[in-house]
Curated annotation (Swiss-Prot):
Subcellular location: Cytoplasm
Positions bound to 3-methyl-2-oxobutanoate: D43, S44, D82, K112
Pathway listed: Cofactor biosynthesis; (R)-pantothenate biosynthesis; (R)-pantoate from 3-methyl-2-oxobutanoate: step 1/2
Matching HAMAP family: PanB (MF_00156)
The protein, known as: 3-methyl-2-oxobutanoate hydroxymethyltransferase
Gene Ontology CC terms, in alphabetical order: cytoplasm
Biological process according to GO: pantothenate biosynthetic process
Protein family: Belongs to the PanB family.
Subunit structure: Homodecamer; pentamer of dimers.
UniProt key word Lipid metabolism: no
UniProt entry tagged with the keyword Glycosyltransferase: no
Location of the active site: E181 (proton acceptor)
Length: 278
């Protein structure tokens, strides 16, 4: 299993880091089989798995439950788990309780937190206690209400400078990596060159140290629309619907199950059961 030390070496050597979300045993198992470097158990599970309109309703218990399943499916892959909405915007003591629960109960190797400001002290607090933390800047889904929706961040010089400073502060606070979401590629490249820790982009262009996508977006599974920055590599949703539709048709028309899908009794046992009469 790769560790944070390996990810630092990958950045130094210019080897791109691959990260993918996973939310359950089968998706994690497939991600590991495909040799993904890092798995993110994102609170995006609230939208793509649980059917919420945002990530806000996701709880610590949800993250623990899903991370445990991912851990069972990907025992040899570095796993990062999101701290959900308001689980770290509380007192330092309560933040530590939530962080400890996720790490101890789920088996996550690192936690991810969104934003800067007061979150910088949270990063320092958690890393000082020995909990690896991945920072997340740019578009931060837990704060879309404040940001005015799902919009590109850092498009003007003033906001770009703030993101640069926030990124540096995240590294200084002890973050082991930084996710940059929906920021101009020029800004993402500049930030990546300023930091010694790896940057993982999602909608941040090519010049970052790695990429992350949502599992369901990448394979077109249960999604109707995807963001501009997503490339869909396969379309399993179409195959799944086709297969289920065929099943429904065959049951309705009596084509399924066939004899080969059924079990039988010996003739003498049938006679003993109902005398050969039905």
């Amino acid at each position: 299993m790769k560790t944070k030390t390996d990810f630092l070496k990958m950045k130094e050597q210019g080897e791109p880091i691959t990260m993918l979300t996973a939310y359950d045993y089968p998706s994690a198992k497939l991600a590991e089989e495909a040799e993904v470097d890092m798995i993110l158990v994102g609170d995006s599970l609230g939208m793509v798995v649980l059917g919420y309109d945002s990530t806000v309703p996701v709880t610590v218990e949800d993250m623990i439950h899903h991370t445990k399943a991912v851990r069972r499916g990907a025992k040899e892959t570095f796993i990062v788990t999101d701290m959900p909405f308001m689980s770290y915007h509380v007192s330092p003591q309560d933040t530590m309780v939530n962080a400890r629960r996720i790490v101890q109960e789920s088996g996550a190797h690192a936690l991810k937190v969104e934003g800067a400001g007061e979150v910088i002290s949270t990063i320092h607090y958690l890393t000082s206690a020995g909990i690896p933390v991945v920072a997340h800047l740019g578009l931060t889904p837990q704060s879309v209400g404040v940001l005015g929706g799902y919009k590109v961040q850092g498009k003007d010089a003033e906001s770009a400078k703030k993101l640069i400073e926030d990124a540096k502060r995240c590294e200084e606070a002890g973050a082991i990596a930084l996710v940059l979401e929906c920021v101009p590629m020029q800004l993402a490249e500049f930030i990546s060159k300023q930091l010694t820790i790896p940057t993982i982009g999602i909608g941040a262009g090519q010049k970052v140290d790695g990429q992350v996508l949502v599992y369901h977006d990448l394979i077109s599974y249960g999604v109707n629309r995807v963001p501009k920055f997503v490339k869909q590599y396969t379309f399993v949703q179409e195959e799944i619907v086709r297969g289920i539709s065929q099943y429904v048709t065959e049951v309705k028309t009596g084509q399924f199950p066939e004899e080969k899908h059924s079990f039988t009794m010996k003739e003498e046992e049938c006679l003993a059961l109902y005398g050969g009469k039905q």
